[in-house]
UniProtKB/Swiss-Prot annotation:
<feature type="active site" description="Acyl-ester intermediate">
    <location>
        <position position="176"/>
    </location>
</feature>
<keyword id="KW-0436">Ligase</keyword>
<dbReference type="GO" id="GO:0006412">
    <property type="term" value="P:translation"/>
</dbReference>
<keyword id="KW-0648">Protein biosynthesis</keyword>
<dbReference type="InterPro" id="IPR004412">
    <property type="entry name" value="GatA"/>
</dbReference>
<dbReference type="InterPro" id="IPR036928">
    <property type="entry name" value="AS_sf"/>
</dbReference>
<dbReference type="InterPro" id="IPR000120">
    <property type="entry name" value="Amidase"/>
</dbReference>
<dbReference type="GO" id="GO:0030956">
    <property type="term" value="C:glutamyl-tRNA(Gln) amidotransferase complex"/>
</dbReference>
<feature type="active site" description="Charge relay system">
    <location>
        <position position="152"/>
    </location>
</feature>
<dbReference type="Pfam" id="PF01425">
    <property type="entry name" value="Amidase"/>
</dbReference>
<comment type="function">
    <text>Allows the formation of correctly charged Gln-tRNA(Gln) through the transamidation of misacylated Glu-tRNA(Gln) in organisms which lack glutaminyl-tRNA synthetase. The reaction takes place in the presence of glutamine and ATP through an activated gamma-phospho-Glu-tRNA(Gln).</text>
</comment>
<dbReference type="GO" id="GO:0005524">
    <property type="term" value="F:ATP binding"/>
</dbReference>
<dbReference type="InterPro" id="IPR020556">
    <property type="entry name" value="Amidase_CS"/>
</dbReference>
<protein>
    <recommendedName>
        <fullName>Glutamyl-tRNA(Gln) amidotransferase subunit A</fullName>
        <ecNumber>6.3.5.7</ecNumber>
    </recommendedName>
</protein>
<keyword id="KW-0067">ATP-binding</keyword>
<feature type="active site" description="Charge relay system">
    <location>
        <position position="77"/>
    </location>
</feature>
<comment type="subunit">
    <text>Heterotrimer of A, B and C subunits.</text>
</comment>
Amino acid sequence: MSFNNQSIDQLHDFLVKKEISATELTKATLEDIHAREQAVGSFITISDEMAIAQAKEIDDKGIDADNVMSGIPLAVKDNISTKGILTTAASKMLYNYEPIFDATAVEKLYAKDMIVIGKANMDEFAMGGSTETSYFKKTNNAWDHSKVPGGSSGGSAAAVASGQVRLSLGSDTGGSIRQPASFNGIVGMKPTYGRVSRFGLFAFGSSLDQIGPMSQTVKENAQLLTVISGHDVRDSTSSERTVGDFTAKIGQDIQGMKIALPKEYLGEGIAQGVKETIIKAAKHLEKLGAVIEEVSLPHSKYGVAVYYIVASSEASSNLQRFDGIRYGYRTENYKNLDDIYVNTRSEGFGDEVKRRIMLGTFSLSSGYYDAYYKKAGQVRSLIIQDFEKVFADYDLILGPTAPTTAFDLDSLNHDPVAMYLADILTIPVNLAGLPGISIPAGFDQGLPVGMQLIGPKFSEETIYQVAAAFEATTDYHKQQPKIFGGEN
């Protein structure tokens, strides 16, 4: 029996009433995963035995009636450390790495008796927008297997969209949760920078990275964010702000709420079908009582250029630790220590990772630091100021999550600039450290279109309020791809 069409609340009710056990739910989820895995390719590792053992332990001590996540399985992106489960970051460099510790976010999952059922495929070290840079495999879009699932959290998104799991964790450095959520027609939240601990997340861009939830519905997304949020002394960038219940405002009306629609978000480069879908979604929010007004974010057009200097510079520094000496892949082709360093990194990293390391090293090098990295930091400040000006008068910002729907597999691999531009609407949110969500807002030629809602720092509850109001009065989130049993 499959339970993938049941909400988390419904599953919790079944578990509390002992209509099913955590073990039965886990086994059913594993059946769903294996039945769809060949078609979608969402996972690098499926931890059958460990997941069933965890479920049996939960059954033995009993389901906690006050903990809605007790006994619920989920997938975790493969750049988030999981003790005893291979964690590869989809790289040859870490093809056999089994961590001896859990990321803080994973510790919080276990503290709520959740079950990590496997590790989701991704772009190597989270560098990519299509999940095609993975060393292990390519993942297919749940709606059309000839399309990409987006990236870098493509496996996490495809697993939810295809009905393999109800929930997953991703990470978002420049759109890596929101863009694949849009491409696969699910809900994906990039929380405020510092909301979720980064301890145990393999660092890419340390000033940009955030772990976040991916789900079928807005409420489930909020429920999972409530679990993983909170201060962590092991992460100096972790916020000390008290974490409440992110579902608190779900169900409240949005009458009178002021929402800004930046003209740049519907300008050049945005596909006509996407543009029309977002305009329709904005009008729907107006019918629900929101006030939608056009604004300008004039420096957002520089976001991609700023991002690829800042993120690549941080990646260049963060990836220095992978040298063939301490852990991970080591070349067999060496005569001296220099050979170990050079050949290990040449053989262990893929082309996209090496491209970004070189770009970052160049940006930080003597004679170029001021012209590139320092200048990028100055423009980043202007992007932040643009958002602050808008949020002085508006509650939220809306727009498309991505400029297009999912593109063909292998279509942009030889055009990195075009691939980078796919994140033009999500990158500024990371540069400013803001929360942003993608929710299903419609379809263009049979492929999902996501609407992005952006708020001031620590406004996740308000974002969920508006997202849930839209979801409750539309049926886009209920439509499913054929692999999940839908008609599309």
